[in-house]
Amino acid sequence: MHEHLKEKLAILPDQPGCYLMKDKQGTVIYVGKAKVLKNRVRSYFTGSHDGKTLRLVGEIVDFEYIVTSSNLEALILELNLIKKHDPKYNIQLKDDKTYPFIKITAEKQPRLLITRNVKKDKGKYFGPYPNAQSAHETKKLLDRMYPLRKCSNMPDKVCLYYHMGQCLAPCVKEVTEEQNKEIVDEIIKFLNGGHKEVRSELETKMYEASEKLEFERAKELRDQIAHIDAIMEKQKMIMSDLVDRDVFGYAVDKGWMCVQVFFVRKGKLIERDVSMFPIYDEPEEGFLTFIGQFYENSSHFKPKEIVVPGSIDSELVERFLEVEATQPKRGKKKDLVELANKNAKIALEEKFYLIERDEERTIKAVENLGKRLGIETPHRIEAFDNSNIQGTNPVSAMIAFIDGKPAKKEYRKYKIKTVQGPDDYESMREVVRRRYTRALKENLPLPDLIIIDGGKGHLAAASDILENELGLYIPMAGLVKDDKHKTSHLIIGDPPEPVMLERNSQEFYLLQRIQDEVHRFAITFHRQLHGKSVIQSALDDIPGIGDKRKKILLKHFGSLKKMKEASVTEFVEAGMPKNVAETIYTYLADKKTL
């Protein structure tokens, strides 16, 4: 341990706060919180740790700390510091798992929509639903029962929905605010768990229609009742109080934490969320960090109640999230927490079983690949591929596999700078030169094996740069494809000799993964550049659009297709003046210009 670390550890306060671990570059690699800073920070440098924590500690060369007045303040500060520094060893929940909601818009003539994008607008949101099918089935039923506007833009004449009795035709008739409010209130009542009352009202209307000999109307009402029954049958009631609540459980093993969340809506368990991540703190601290990030995710509404395991400080959760938090001692809520804990434990056990089995196979594949090539075990493999469809936007990509697994933080993209036109060999020479010149200059780790996606010419070009120009002697192999552009075999040596691998072997499978991954990475980069150039060229002739506005539009919309579908308002929201937005809209609407 560095002497200055010992000195800083000796003067740590016994107060709550946050600590920031730094590596040799001064980069914050981990942020944590503690009830007692002195005890928590010192624990990293004493006692035994699992492999993941050892890797973290091995990179720490300095730390800072911030004293707070309470545990709650430390928790809030920790989340802000994680967002600011994005440390590589911290949990960072991805905001990519979104659930569908049913939305009643706040328009003068409101509509029912399904959305995964919950905004802070005046609309009313109901959900989340476990999947799109469930949301669509419910909306379809509501569309049949309640005649709100269906069209996104007001047509000039009544549509089919009006003739089907599913719309009041505000496009041509006056529909008052009171009429809309009455319909919206009925929908809200249904979505808030009042389906039994709605069903009873429909049943009464059905019998009345039958007595009046209005058999078509009675049949429509009967079908609506059947649809309600079908949808509600799929959702098993587990709580009788109809309170919306999220029930949390967790398990910890081998330096990993699994958190399971059960979403209970209107008394029904509709879905669960499973998250697994490495943990470097005490389990309770890791859980609090998780739950803070969980509700920062825009797809996770805070329910009326949050139910947490007995080991968690529910009062702290309640003050932090500003929502009721409970630790059940008995009853159905306690049963649900125990079920969530049990599921978390099972999920971790399955993960470790699969990891152990996969790691054994992967390590064996790397060892066998080295033996077949006659080299030392290639723990670090770097692979290169070029991409230049139709000679435009030539690029190359490098990926790294460490012990048979992709190390995505090590991936690199290259725009070809010195080569004119599509010349694969010269492109390969340029990229190999750039990669390993920098590796030597910055003392970066060198690979045990370099794989070039190509034949003898590509291999010769890369070898020439590596050996004759840079003086590096690293085993290098060419990855040859068959006529279907699939992995065939390797070539290695001078002159290159083929190395045939059994197609059902783990080492062949490893090569396939490397080839697919480097090809995917290269072609994705090429498409990004090509897409940008297509958009920019398409906007070249529009008055008032310079390079700055092109970049703004590209960043906001991402593709020409989305721009063609956008309205004038959406162009204004992207930062365009209204007159420019109208010009862009008119230009893109004219298909002859594109």
Curated annotation (Swiss-Prot):
Query: Per the annotation, which location comes first and is thus the protein's main one?
Result: cytoplasm
GO cellular component, alphabetical, reads: cytoplasm; excinuclease repair complex
Indicate whether Transmembrane appears among the record's keywords: no
Name the Gene Ontology molecular function terms of this record: DNA binding; excinuclease ABC activity
Q: What organism is this sequence from? A: Bacillus cereus (strain ATCC 10987 / NRS 248)
- Alphabetical GO biological process terms: nucleotide-excision repair; SOS response
Outline what the protein does. Answer: The UvrABC repair system catalyzes the recognition and processing of DNA lesions. UvrC both incises the 5' and 3' sides of the lesion. The N-terminal half is responsible for the 3' incision and the C-terminal half is responsible for the 5' incision.
Instruction: State the gene name recorded for this protein.
Output: uvrC
Q: How does it assemble?
A: Interacts with UvrB in an incision complex.
Protein name as annotated: UvrABC system protein C
Matching entries from InterPro entries are given as:
GIY-YIG_endonuc, GIY-YIG_endonuc_sf, GIY-YIG_UvrC_Cho, RuvA_2-like, UVR_dom, UVR_dom_sf, UvrABC_protein_C, UvrC
Q: Where in the cell is it found?
A: Cytoplasm
